[in-house]
Amino acid sequence: MGGLFLILYETSVELLYIFSTAFLYPDIVALLLLFAWSLALLGSLINEYTSRHRALSELEEISLQAADLRREGRAKEAAEALSSYRCPQQLSLALEQIGRSLETELFDLKFEKILQDLELSMARALEPLRIGVKAGPILGLMGTLIPMGPALIGLSQGDIKSLADNLVIAFATTVIGLVVGGICYAVLVIRGRWYRQDLSDLEYVVELLRGRKDEAA
């Protein structure tokens, strides 16, 4: 009976070893793809930073102008005025939607929907970054632990070359995983701040439009 349990134990250990080591190459490939993606993210962040335009006084002036045009019954021109403000694409699309809603009597309700949709769109854009923050270090840890088994076997057999090769893989995957997580976290924080600022500006635009509408009433 004891021999049977021993055989089952040895078989289970061998299967665990085979399954765990089988994940090494997919893990390395996934890490390299994530690393390339994170570098592309960093480049897109720099490009977005150089192209972002925010002029609060200009936005305020355009919003007040649009409010005056709407009060005069020139809703189409008011929408064109809002669309003329140069800003990030998501905010620009939201301003266009707000401009179109000026032509209806459901402006307040439409604004709430536009704002909610914009918040969801921004959250959706940040989701891959949140995944990258977690996935990078997790894959890095997997890439560290998986080669440790073969490394210990090599050490027990006096195979220094096998030990060294596996340790190199272990340390390299750790570093790459942490770099991926760090880049994703930095991009997440910076873009999150930009998106919150865009939402704040959008709310300010609508408050200006509402204020002029209330004055007219």
Positions of the model-derived regions?
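Short, charged cytosolic
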Residues: 2-5, 96-116
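Short runs of predominantly hydrophobic/aromatic residues within well-ordered alpha helices
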Residues: 32, 36, 88-91, 108-111
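Acidic, Ser/Thr-rich low-complexity segments on the non-lumenal side of membrane proteins
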Residues: 69-103, 217
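Generic alpha-helical secondary structure signal
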Residues: 89, 105, 109, 158-161, ...
